[in-house]
């Protein structure tokens, strides 16, 4: 196959060499539109047809338009002798997005990427090729800027991200249109492209024309910002940049270093760790900003941020990011704890350092886990009402303290704080927890 314009071929060759990519089989995300058609034909030529076109039918648009697009895709691949796989979405994206509380765009993207990953494995391919171009990159940077992204966001769409490649990121939309026109190649026009249904369309159709009128050549400036942002991001990727102690279920930071470091670097470090652990978390800047209001000299330990997957805590002179996977290793407990003696739990070794009760001779307490809470109440409803006060605490960390079978205190083993006490009986208590999730 020979094209009248080989400019895109040159850029794809440069892209492959720059990123040291092999020429093994590629799954090409194909919609029949201008960008993916250009990518498909150029990769067919560059990789000697070692490609598979993959079409994902979302069925967000009317069925008749979706079916016409499918027919176009089939006819196109037959014409150019390209292997094609079609996958139809098995959920109703519109109704499911409402149920999940996410945007149609976000859910559609997730379904599409999952299908592409499955196609990659099923066909023993090396890469998934997406047709994002230079203009898509500019739109993305603008959207992320107005959404308050960090440098990682302003770096733009990565050209290579694990097994996903984007060979057209250095190719502009006019270059794509010129390629299609010169070679008389027909494409399918998505009717929603001209409608302002989605954020990208609004940016493309409404915002960019206004920016172009005021800031001529703004694209070059945004490309420069993107390049500088990438350099900073790559520099901050160095492991030694911020000292971190890593355990089985936690990451621990020095409190002073944590607070002295620029907020941006702390935020991206937290997100980087969460991503490495496979945790997708939506945390607001406001919530993260609260972390920096900690008083260094204050001795009190406390939970700073809590989600379903992890929590951030201040403990002594450390900030700890702890994952809730420890619940798999947790075992209920019921034992007698004496002053000055250690006792082993699944959460670590515990020491009762100090105990003062109204009875001077008391030097031991009965300690048990949350599972045994009902033994101290004759009425279950009263028990439920009483323990509803501690709904914000993780139950696996609550240690109940009893004297003569009477509940006199509750300690949160995560923070080592006394969260409740019968003040007429329990005057003072101090414990240590070593090992388990965290090392002291």
Curated annotation (Swiss-Prot):
Alphabetical list of InterPro entries matching this protein: Rossmann-like_a/b/a_fold (IPR014729), TilS/TtcA_N (IPR011063), tRNA_Ile_lys_synt (IPR012094), tRNA_Ile_lys_synt_N (IPR012795)
One GO BP: tRNA modification
A GO term, aspect molecular function: tRNA(Ile)-lysidine synthase activity
Documented EC number(s): 6.3.4.19
Name of a matching Pfam family: ATP_bind_3
Binding residue positions for ATP: 31-36
Cellular component GO terms held in the UniProt record: cytoplasm
Domains (record comment): The N-terminal region contains the highly conserved SGGXDS motif, predicted to be a P-loop motif involved in ATP binding.
Name listed for the protein in its UniProt record: tRNA(Ile)-lysidine synthase
The encoding gene: tilS
């Amino acid at each position: 196959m020979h094209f009248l314009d080989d400019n895109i071929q040159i850029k794809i060759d440069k892209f492959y060499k720059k990123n040291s990519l092999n020429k093994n089989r590629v799954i090409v995300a194909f919609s029949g539109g201008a960008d993916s058609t250009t990518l498909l034909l150029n990769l067919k030529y560059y990789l000697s047809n070692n490609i598979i076109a993959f079409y994902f039918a979302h069925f967000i648009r009317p069925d008749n338009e979706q079916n016409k697009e499918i027919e176009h895709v089939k006819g196109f691949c037959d014409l150019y002798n390209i292997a094609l796989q079609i996958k139809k979405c098995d959920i109703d994206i519109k109704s499911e997005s409402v149920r999940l509380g996410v945007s149609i765009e976000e859910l559609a993207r997730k379904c599409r990427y999952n299908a592409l990953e499955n196609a990659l494995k099923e066909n023993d391919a090396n890469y998934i090729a997406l047709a994002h171009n230079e203009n898509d990159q500019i739109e993305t940077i603008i959207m992320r800027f107005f959404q308050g992204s960090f440098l990682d966001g302003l770096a733009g769409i990565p050209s290579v991200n694990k097994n996903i490649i984007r060979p057209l990121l250095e190719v502009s939309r006019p270059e794509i249109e010129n390629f299609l026109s010169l070679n008389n190649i027909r494409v399918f026009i998505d009717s929603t492209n001209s409608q302002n249904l989605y954020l990208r369309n609004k940016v493309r159709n409404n915002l960019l024309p206004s920016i172009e009128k005021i800031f001529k050549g703004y694209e070059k400036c945004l490309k420069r910002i993107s390049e500088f942002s990438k350099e900073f991001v790559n520099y901050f990727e160095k492991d030694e940049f911020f000292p971190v102690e890593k355990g089985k279920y936690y990451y621990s930071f020095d409190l002073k270093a944590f607070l002295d470091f620029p907020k941006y670097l702390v935020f991206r470090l937290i997100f980087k760790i969460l991503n490495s652990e496979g945790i997708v978390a939506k945390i607001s800047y406001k919530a993260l900003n609260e972390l920096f209001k900690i008083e260094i000299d204050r001795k009190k330990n406390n939970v700073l941020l809590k989600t379903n997957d992890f929590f951030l805590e201040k403990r002594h002179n450390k900030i700890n990011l702890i994952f809730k996977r420890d619940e798999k290793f947790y075992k209920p407990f019921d034992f007698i704890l004496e002053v000055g003696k250690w006792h082993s739990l699944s959460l670590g070794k515990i020491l009762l350092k100090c105990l003062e009760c109204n009875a001077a001779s008391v030097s031991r307490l009965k300690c048990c886990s949350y599972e045994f809470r009902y033994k101290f109440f004759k009425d279950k409803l009263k028990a439920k009402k009483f323990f509803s006060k501690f709904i914000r605490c993780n139950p696996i960390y609550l240690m109940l303290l009893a004297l003569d079978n009477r509940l006199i205190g509750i300690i949160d083993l995560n923070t080592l704080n006394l969260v409740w006490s019968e003040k007429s009986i329990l005057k003072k208590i101090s414990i240590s927890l070593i090992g388990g999730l965290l090392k002291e």
